[in-house]
């Protein structure tokens, strides 16, 4: 196993052990680069996470990721329409990628929002996570 893969497993396994959870009960999330990492880890894990929530991120390398997908985890991506750091067009590109790869995707473009997480985005994420935890 690669070092990156060993670290992914180690963190997930520690959380599972400490909180007595299954991977299917764990939601992963990230902002900006953390979103990019969450998508990568969540879709290439050998066990499916409950869901992924990403804020202001993008897919780093679509060709590479599409060849490594092992889990079809439900995803919510949220982006501000005024984001100067990670352009909002990345949300649409990611949505297209997920649809083409048959991954359930929900998106939210927040109006008048730059590169941060507003209350509207936090509320949407919380509702998405609740729905996914209840339905699994």
Which residues does each PLM region occupy?
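Single conserved hydrophobic/aromatic residue that forms the stacking wall/gate
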Residues: 1-11
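Short beta-strand/loop motif that positions the catalytic acidic residue
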Residues: 76-79, 83
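A conserved short beta-strand
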Residues: 47-59
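Short, proline-enriched alpha-helix->beta-strand connector loops that line the catalytic pocket
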Residues: 23, 70-75, 101-104
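Gly/Ala-rich beta-loop-alpha elbow adjacent to hydrolase catalytic centers
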Residues: 29-34, 38
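C-terminal catalytic histidine-bearing segment of alpha/beta-hydrolase fold enzymes
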Residues: 92-136
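Active-site signature of alpha/beta-hydrolase-fold catalytic machinery across serine-
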Residues: 40-44
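Alpha/beta-hydrolase fold nucleophile elbow
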Residues: 20-30
């Amino acid at each position: 196993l690669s070092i990156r893969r060993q670290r992914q497993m180690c963190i997930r396994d520690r959380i599972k052990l400490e909180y007595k959870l299954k991977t299917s009960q764990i939601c992963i999330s990230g902002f900006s680069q953390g979103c990019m990492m969450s998508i990568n880890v969540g879709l290439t894990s050998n066990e499916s996470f409950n869901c992924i929530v990403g804020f202001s991120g993008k897919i780093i390398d679509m060709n590479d990721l599409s060849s490594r997908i092992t889990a079809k985890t439900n995803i919510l991506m949220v982006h501000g329409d005024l984001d100067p750091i990670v352009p909002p067009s990345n949300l649409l590109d990611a949505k297209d990628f997920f649809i083409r790869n048959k991954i359930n995707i929900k998106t939210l473009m927040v109006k008048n929002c730059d590169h941060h997480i507003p209350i509207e985005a936090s509320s949407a994420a919380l509702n998405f996570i609740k729905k996914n935890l209840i339905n699994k």
